[in-house]
Amino acid sequence: MAVLASAAAVLTIAGGAGAAAAPTTLTASLSGEAEPEGGQGSGTARLTLDPATGRVCFNIRLRGVGTTAAGHIHRGAEGVAGPVVIALYGEPTRRPRGCVQDQPAAAIRQILRRPGRFYVNVHTAAHPDGAARGQLER
C-alpha cells in the first residue's frame, strides 16, 4: 500500500511540474491612451510563452499606428513605466508577429505567475517611448 501511495505522489508531482512548464497564452488590449505621449493606436497582443524552451511567440494587431519600430514586454503595473524584460522585435514592420528564442526561463515564469505586473509596449518613430501599451492577462 505504501508503494502505491509513493507512486501516486511521484506521478502527481511529475504531472504538476509538466503542467507548470507547458506553453501558456496571454493577451493584452493595447491603447495609445495608456502611454503618456502615445498615439491614437489600439489593438491586441497575443503571446505564447514556453518556459521549458525559452520561446516567446507573439502576434500583435494594431490600428491607427502604421509602421512600428519595436515591441517589448516590460515589467510594470498599469500606469507605471518599467524596464524591458523580453524584446519581441526591433525591426520596422506593419504586422508584428513571430517568435524569439532563448529567453530566460526565470523571466518567463515571473510573467506567467503574475501577468498583470507586465505589459506589452509597441514603439514607432513618431512615438519612440511607446505608441500603444497594454497589461498582460490570462
What are these regions (language model features)?
Residues 2-71, 75-138:
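Metal-centered catalytic cores of metalloenzymes
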